[in-house]
Amino acid sequence: MPAIEVGRICVKVKGREAGSKCVIVDIIDDNFVLVTGPKDITGVKRRRVNILHLEPTDKKIDIQKGASDEEVKKKLEESNLTEYMKEKIKIRMPTL
């Protein structure tokens, strides 16, 4: 089971959207993936993200590579994961 794969639900750990959940829609290369919230569910808009800024979860939805936000939203509703996606995660930064 690869951690970074299309359909994997992840938590963003860096940036302005830190603590928000997103879905991997496409794998661009070894370092970057395309993610979406979708924006109306989690507030994460569709964008390219470094994989070091993501923490994969154990949850995955069955979507095609490059799926639209509407397709992702429909699959989340079918899987009863909409409320799970809306939950924010508190990110704690290590202190020195």
Curated annotation (Swiss-Prot):
One of its GO terms (biological process) is ribosomal large subunit biogenesis. Keywords: Ribonucleoprotein, Ribosomal protein. GO terms for cellular component: cytosolic large ribosomal subunit. InterPro entries: Rib_uL2_dom2, Ribosomal_eL14, Ribosomal_eL14_arc, Translation_prot_SH3-like_sf. One of its GO terms (molecular function) is RNA binding. Transmembrane segments: none annotated. Belongs to the eukaryotic ribosomal protein eL14 family. This is Large ribosomal subunit protein eL14. It comes from Saccharolobus solfataricus (strain ATCC 35092 / DSM 1617 / JCM 11322 / P2). The lineage of its organism: Archaea, Thermoproteota, Thermoprotei, Sulfolobales, Sulfolobaceae.
